[in-house]
């Protein structure tokens, strides 16, 4: 099942179900579920509830997608996004080539950092260039995991039931800010730096766990990234199990699982984003997240 957040014709922002073909929308409020945000609804959208919703929407007229304004599925995350750095081997190599001082690529343990998201950028929304502050703007196409229930001290091999679903996240990054500060938080947390979407696809739509999905990124139609989430160094099962040891991961937590090779800083010479560039992040089985830099 696919979930979105959208603005209805009357201006109300509502979580909703999206049809598999992306053409029809059923607001949850039409189905008797009164939740202000999808984050609020997620803990209650169990497999049993979703099965009932599937039956219910079969008899209810839908809104056409053109009648609503698509927002990010989780427009304002309750907590910072948890991110993994250097989680594909080929990206590790290009990051070290760009700046071994700023990117610690030799590691035996996962690298975690957080990303502040005041308001997530929806599919079709704008990446803010911040040209007064940023001269080296970069993209990072990533698979993001959304937790469906609180996780604490979950053993590896038992994390699957804690995953609500998956979405696409573009971890937009200011490389010059990163290298200047020798850390990643500030350079990844500027307003307009976190496109998320276009929807959340529930975990039961994918047979494998962790899923092994083709992941690609295009800039102005040119393929820049082309990999598979199965090539992650630390997979989703490992990450949830490790992070939940001594730390409670709340339902609705978003974990961005790292980007593959092909980012702008890894090119020779580096090629960074400028206003007017269009970035498309694509993960098979989820969709395409398209944003323009301004």
Regions found by a protein language model. Give the residues of each.
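Short acidic-glycine loop/turn motifs at beta-strand connectors
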Residues: 8-10, 18-24, 147-149, 203, ...
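Catalytic-pocket segment enriched in acidic/His residues
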Residues: 13, 49-50, 61-63, 68-69, ...
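N-terminal non-catalytic cap/leader segment that marks the start of a structured domain
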Residues: 1-106, 110, 280
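Short beta-strand segments
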Residues: 7, 83-84, 114, 138-148, ...
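Short catalytic-site patches enriched in acidic/histidine residues
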Residues: 98, 111-130, 151-152, 192-201, ...
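Structural signature of FAD isoalloxazine-binding scaffolds in flavoprotein oxidoreductases
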Residues: 100-121, 139, 274-285
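Non-heme Fe(II) oxygenase catalytic core, chiefly the N-lobe of the double-stranded beta-helix
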Residues: 121-159, 164, 169-173
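A generic local secondary-structure boundary/capping motif
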Residues: 4, 71-73, 100-103, 128-137, ...
